[in-house]
Amino acid sequence: MGRVIRAQRKGEGSVFTAHTKKRKGEPKLRALDYAERHGYLKGTVKQIIHDPGRGAPLAVVHFRDPYKFNVRKQLFIAAEGMYTGQFVYCGKRAQLQIGNVLPIGLMPEGTIVCNLEEKTGDRGKLARTSGNYASVIAHNPDTKRTRVKLPSGAKKVLPSANRAMVGIVAGGGRIDKPILKAGRAYRKYKVKRNCWPKVRGVAMNPVEHPHGGGNHQHIGKASTVKRGTPPGRKVGLIAARRTGRIRGGKGDEKFKEKEKK
């Protein structure tokens, strides 16, 4: 067998781990406590900041400690429309306004939310990327469950006690602007992780990649591989259910007409 390929090296970590040195901190919802379960807490957005390596901006929110004379600083993923000086309310009795945090079971069907909890009290795991959002579809009061549509389009049933922030994650449309030059791509990925530039497998030598080698750049074999393929060979279309063009869409009408002719 050839050398240890890039995919095997990535699995080990080392130089491929995320660059977190200049990050501002982990943004998450308040820890679930008695005040949020039975009432609400009022916070103030002090600052909207940029977090290197993240597309969405962060909001620095100050809360009064409900149990002692103290101010607690919290990092939230900013929702679109949040501003400095805004009052943010977290809890069961909070109103349905952009930036507020409340249980999804109390939101009307069709509400757009972000930073959604997957398990009650985990402080936000779903719909956190810039421009992303989840939507509340339906409630089941008997089982205390709520059906939610995730950014991927998948529908998931979650406990109604799970909290979420009302609104869409800020920074939408970020990927619409083209990168245009290599310097911007270099700086973009330098602050994220070591994954750029990415050399194609067909451009390598046969000892470095299963797709490498040959008098011209071609894979030379089927690019689909089994799920149980050993590391070093497991590259390409892994356990693909199907390959090729997806037929039946709007773009295939002209293609069908040409075939008939």
UniProtKB/Swiss-Prot annotation:
Give the family per the record.
Belongs to the universal ribosomal protein uL2 family.
> What is the protein named?
Large ribosomal subunit protein uL2
Q: Where is this region: Disordered?
A: 207-233
Q: Does the keyword Chloroplast apply?
A: no
Cystine connections: none
Give GO MF terms, alphabetically: rRNA binding; structural constituent of ribosome
Subcellular location per the Swiss-Prot or TrEMBL entry: Cytoplasm
